[in-house]
Amino acid sequence: MAVAWKSRASSIAFGIVLLGSLFAFVSAKDEAPKLGTVIGIDLGTTYSCVGVYKDGKVEIIANDQGNRITPSWVAFTNDERLIGEAAKNQAAANPERTIFDVKRLIGRKFEDKEVQKDMKLVPYKIVNRDGKPYIQVKVQEGETKVFSPEEISAMILTKMKETAETFLGKKIKDAVVTVPAYFNDAQRQATKDAGVIAGLNVARIINEPTAAAIAYGLDKRGGEKNILVFDLGGGTFDVSVLTIDNGVFEVLATNGDTHLGGEDFDQRLMEYFIKLIKKKHTKDISKDNRALGKLRRECERAKRALSSQHQVRVEIESLFDGVDFSEPLTRARFEELNNDLFRKTMGPVKKAMDDAGLEKNQIDEIVLVGGSTRIPKVQQLLKEFFNGKEPSKGVNPDEAVAFGAAVQGSILSGEGGEETKEILLLDVAPLTLGIETVGGVMTKLIPRNTVIPTKKSQVFTTYQDQQTTVTIQVFEGERSLTKDCRLLGKFDLTGIAPAPRGTPQIEVTFEVDANGILNVKAEDKASGKSEKITITNDKGRLSQEEIERMVREAEEFAEEDKKVKEKIDARNSLETYIYNMKNQISDADKLADKLESDEKEKIEGAVKEALEWLDDNQSAEKEDYDEKLKEVEAVCNPIITAVYQRSGGPSGESGADSEDSEEGHDEL
């Protein structure tokens, strides 16, 4: 690249960085009136969770199934779109149209080795769209659509938003959304975009281990404590070392692996059973998506059971060709199959400790977060690493992240009150940020684990005589050459006055905001000309037009979902009325003995005809069901009214109305 380093001290003192963080905190307080209630969403690879700070405490909100965590799954059938449990429960029967693990695709490039590996493991189709992995799926009979990972994530975020709205009884537009601490710039920005598509203002992106640390330390007062958060979830792994001191949460170092978690442990089990089936039954099920769906679900169940049992039986009815599958699985075998992956988690722990400059005996508490930390072997390895120190069981590993996000939301909205006013977060940039200089050298402006928000400037100069344009290429990574780092984006600064090499002064400024997202500016000091980075497609960022289109499509889907629900409700109303009538005319305690024979025949005829019509019109529209209900009522209601008048009972529009009030409830 045509810029060379020019000597000028560029480091900003930690005190100023700290003031920057304090300023951001004060600013958040100043902005508070603009925000409504801010919910906290843990958008997980396998499960998501939502919380809100209310009446002086955090409420983790249960979904419509009564569960406090919701599967991060989306599915399409010919009739509707399903999200959460409903999507996961039908996966084995509808594998190609059921989407999961989308967090492993978000913000990545199609050619990333992780994406190429995942493509072989999921039953749905991942396609290349402008260098990004998109999901191609049949949304209904005869219609196939292509979705970005952001759009699928937005569907899950919408589900979490609606869960919170139902609980709070009002519309929600603001949220704090969490990401793995080791997510890079593109992955953070893509998560923010997903929030926009879901109709949310993402007030802040915060790191999952930091959120979990808040959950752990919210009520901890007293002296300074060093804690290590070990966050092993369904798809990602983070380690953060923090100091907590009377409400101030300062991250000292963070490390991790954005492609390691429970899904990988499930995959090892699946590979083991696929080989076993091939050996025992001479049947290869590795390309049979339905069989794999059943096996995936059973492997996840077995893995969970082995956290509390030493042996389980993996049983699947009619796995393939009508053959029932039944095999024992011991905890020892499970640990052997995943031994290298479990041990892999210790590498980031050591790096984070080294970066924080702490000895093992200086860690006061080890906080476990994420469902995979329930695995006994993982706990054992961690305990051995810290010379026998027991990890803390003080937080719920499934809910801690959403809990912390909800607390941060209450701080931003000003609804936290006395309990949260002392809290201050000082988080860090997880990866070194810099630009390419002559010879492909990575010149670092912001080292990893720098407290954010932060701003750093450095002066560079031209490499050639009379050079009027320089290209600024921005990278993230820890290697000394840019070819081994990740390109975030590039832009040109033009209009530099021609001069001998080494004369022009070009100031490059890196600014990382509180979300961990980077902005870069380059300015020619002589002319005052400046350029800011515009995120290009090679960074994997959605354009504004794409986001707007996706927002419109998300709204259309919401409208379609509403129509589907109205259609189901209309069908249920018709069915309820018909079966009510059928029940009443055959029950002596109700209408059977009070009807004339011709009246009974008329009602029986109307009921029979309506039931046949229902069988023949499984996918009728709402209006058709409403019309049919009116037709049946037109036959039955006058007869019911006449009967009640004859018998001196209350006349009513319908026999259904005189039933117990429970008839008005939705049917399960």
From Swiss-Prot:
Protein name from the UniProt record: Luminal-binding protein
Top-level lineage group: Eukaryota
Gene Ontology MF term list: ATP binding; ATP hydrolysis activity; ATP-dependent protein folding chaperone; heat shock protein binding; protein folding chaperone
Glycosylation: residue positions: N617
Gene (UniProt): HSC70
Matches recorded under PANTHER family: HEAT SHOCK PROTEIN 70KDA (PTHR19375)
Keywords: ATP-binding, Endoplasmic reticulum, Glycoprotein, Nucleotide-binding, Signal
Record organism: Spinacia oleracea (Spinach)
Region described as Disordered: spans on this chain: 643-668
Signal peptide: 1-28
Subcellular location: Endoplasmic reticulum lumen
GO biological process annotation, one example: ERAD pathway
Function field: Probably plays a role in facilitating the assembly of multimeric protein complexes inside the ER.
Family: Belongs to the heat shock protein 70 family.
Cited Gene3D superfamilies: 1.20.1270.10, 3.30.420.40, Actin, Chain A, domain 4, Substrate Binding Domain Of DNAk, Chain A, domain 1
Placement of sequence motif Prevents secretion from ER: 665-668
Cell cycle among keywords: no
PROSITE patterns: ER_TARGET, HSP70_1, HSP70_2, HSP70_3
